[in-house]
């Protein structure tokens, strides 16, 4: 027995005979795992053999008893060195496994616990009678049985269940004997009963006719009176259970045979369950349409283990919709409350409900108004504004702000006095809590110091008149023994005042110590402190701002001052005094401050607000002026004054207080703090700053009792009464507010999961208790309360006062708020002088240049139509701004690609915003402006028309036109705000962003803000973390339910990758939104809109200045080749050949592993689109547009166009590919343009099956009348989303330019591809030749097949596909060259590519550039020099050496003896 195990046995007081038995002869404790949060101690024991069952049970019992004394749990596992197993021992442990296993059902245990077990080699045979359901047992117990036995020390056994003839016979005999007894007893009872009945029987009555239908109805299962089983109680398979709960997830599947399976999940809020219901067909499924998300159902069925999900699932037999109890506000109309303190999911990682839920709940309960008060932000305002208008109730806009003092003083009661001459009393107090009003002084200690020397000391304990709590003793080290015979408080106070005469008082965090002393002085009729007081906490913060922590502990450690017993006043006081004289010396040397009166003026930093204690206050918008002011406050607090949290200095709040109303907030507010720490009189002075006082239900404050900040419920009620008194004294309304963080009480767990995910570093998760018993304090019950629930909370105040606080005062205050416009109703574009004239002039100028003057009618009418919409709706400035950005990027040498539908606008084409021409396919002569338009739909793209010479002058005609209607951009009436998305080169994007600032001004240009919420996968992780940290176990359905509840809460903010919001220069940003930094990064170059940009995108101009690889690639290819990309034809035969085979590349499909030449071609190079190309073999530009649309749409290709093409019903050119095709096709068929447009809009948004049947049938009838085929109509019904044709055209044009170089200038193409597009490299493989490349590709392919490939390997496979193709085409990869390789780009050397340094794994761009700079300074003479000058790590140098890059380079450049001789 090891020493550790022996100590444990003594601690457990194990019986001596067991302790000395052979079982513990070689016993050891292998390890102990302590799970602090769940308070579980996990022992791992090692024994020579399996313990006798009675010793095991005794060890288990004593461990559990011993650890439960401290609130912990003990579990253990056993490892046996040479286990010897007998059948008798095995039988005993088999029964123990049942007792401790998860099979909770009594019926299950009674059936299987007493089966006979024995060993056969390494197999555990379990035998039972033939009546035993071995399959049921195998599924429900075997998986756990083997695992349980291993924990007991048994070896890993294979468990088998089988029937035994012997046991079957024995069971039959026992059953017969028992049955004979039962029958005999029953017969005897029956005879007695018959005799009694015969004596009492009335005359026989005539039997009613047999009613089959009535009997059948009566036999139908009824669930109304069925016993409902809580889901939490079901841990194993059971039959005929009834659940009642809410459906929170639903999926319907139809099998190939037509059967319908409904998989759904329900919760009863004790747990959650997976359920499934099979139905014969979809017709039968309609009978169960009550199964839908949000529905409350009562269901009956059998619970079985699902072999696929490996979780218990109910196979549902009966379903009944039930009415679920909903909380209602039971007070009559006119007597309902108004909630003035509610948080939405925009309170970062703190609250759950969307603002729409809060508004809807208030409206449902008949409340006339509700306020929202998120922490430090107003991001729920826009959605709240729309929700309140829809619900028809008043929304009061507010926030819970963090208020700080601008400059926190170091000295109070300052006087003119030299610091070096003063006498100081450095003191500290110990108390039973933080409240000077409700807690007691238990120690006052001080050191009187002069010139750095202690000249007198004061140290007195004080008897509080009651036993000290464990918390106080743990924290301070002061026990009841210390204070039992101490002096009375009043005597200590008088003696201390005398001790302090003619001295400067000093304390660390002096406001607490001085506040405590003053309250006690006043209570005993003694004068308050009037002499100077120095706060060493603020002294340190201002003197050493570079330190992260300024607590007494960290400071004494930093300055090497002894602090033996922190939180005992005498030790703390002496340590503080030692620090004081260090500070006095440093402040004189660093800042020249030597006088007490100069500390505040010369040392207190203007940024001292950053360290000031934050106090909460609720700020509400009273009118439109207040809205703008709260926007300014939010902006300043999130930018200029942000420090950890958004802070509002008091003077800043004062400067912007017009139109705002201030409430005193929660227990983190200064009014509450003053009431608790200083008393009502002091709180009255503080409360003068506020417009109303908030009190909250006792349940909201109850966690403070757990934290021992409040003694009990009685003291809590006194605090609430005192808060009410503060308001009454000042004549300010007192409002009962709920501090709402979720709607329903059962949603508390979701907030618990979110908050605990922040970890113990978050203030809200600070633990109470010490050591293993430390746990986060409970969270308050913060659901949205009805009026009657709120009145119940405040019933202790009496009915009249409770109604005043809950109903009267909130309603009266709500009436003082004016309506405000949070979101503007119009678009406000910036002003650019003569924008309309410029757009029109540029348009016609370019049109005349191309098409001549006068313009062809088709061109003239299109321009007139577009300009009428653009200029008439104020969109000219949007067009002109985009044109200016594109022009500037073009001037820097980059093409700009368009996205979205802007290519539908011919004006955009003419002024250079897009290169997509949306006119009908046409010819035009570049010499004489002759033009010819094809308007019959015979060509899908002008690029597909045959070449033709000009009939007027013989010059070769240009071909263009994609046949895209303008309506798809600005709507049928041309009044939809244009959304112009532009793809700039990623290299040029930062310059383009700065162009926006340059054009409009930095005070008017902001990055488009985004709000990041907790995603479903993240929420799942939070739930699993909570499960782990707090010792929970949830089945899969419950994890999913909890994750759904926790998802959607704001987690961070960010910025759109290219979106820039432009504020009109005749307004300011606060007319629309506050501003902030993305993700609270105050070092960011750009500020963002505080609101999610979608919330204001119809009010201000948003430019999408996006970064993309295509323009960068084109620029690179142009630089390499000198070819102008605008000269590349869109109908090059060689390029089109790529889409039908590999011959044009000079390779076979076997060589490159794909039947076409699509590898590395933008838009067409993914596996998905390559598969589409293989199936369709496009031959025209129009068909490539179709492919682009099909690949980007949802339910456009799969299960739709793909099937139509396979079945020969349609071909690639006729299926629906892009959204615009629908309108154009239907117009060509003869439909009215307005109807064609409307049908397109319904289909592209996936609304075809969601609109009314009447509307849809009207469209279908019109389509059929115009000979639109049936398959086309059915195809429309399947579509969920469609890609704009203009977007497809822009992408395809870029793709074909890249493909042109792949066909005709391959080395340039591969150089550009690897420099710009490739994401992962393996230089050793790439330079190793074809065999090495193909071998590595095979390795990764095998991994991908088994889902074992990493993301990097998947990216590398894509790179190697292109490498393989390049090598097969006869080009080569060189090795990295220390003196040739570029930092980040591949270089061409004949038919060989030289890789850059950045392609080497682990070598970043910055280090690569450093290597290039270093080599320009001179040759590297050694590896040591390469490391130092090139900034390379030893690992990277070793890699270079392994790859042969360094040749024979020596380790260092010191000459050896031999070097000198030779």
UniProtKB/Swiss-Prot annotation:
The keyword Nucleotidyltransferase applies. Gene3D superfamilies: 1.10.150.870, 3.30.1900.20, 6.10.140.1510, Metal-dependent hydrolases, Nucleic acid-binding proteins, PolC, middle finger domain, Ribonuclease H-like superfamily/Ribonuclease H. One of its GO terms (cellular component) is cytoplasm. Coiled coil: none annotated. Residues 424-580 form the Exonuclease domain. Pfam families: DNA_pol3_a_NI (PF14480), DNA_pol3_a_NII (PF11490), DNA_pol3_alpha (PF07733), DNA_pol3_finger (PF17657), HHH_6 (PF14579), PHP (PF02811), RNase_T (PF00929), tRNA_anti-codon (PF01336). GO terms for molecular function: 3'-5' exonuclease activity; DNA binding; DNA-directed DNA polymerase activity. SUPFAM superfamilies: Nucleic acid-binding proteins, PHP domain-like, Ribonuclease H-like. Its EC number is 2.7.7.7. Transmembrane segments: none annotated. One of its GO terms (biological process) is DNA-templated DNA replication. Required for replicative DNA synthesis. This DNA polymerase also exhibits 3' to 5' exonuclease activity. Belongs to the DNA polymerase type-C family. PolC subfamily. This is DNA polymerase III PolC-type. It comes from Streptococcus sanguinis (strain SK36). The lineage of its organism: Bacteria, Bacillati, Bacillota, Bacilli, Lactobacillales.
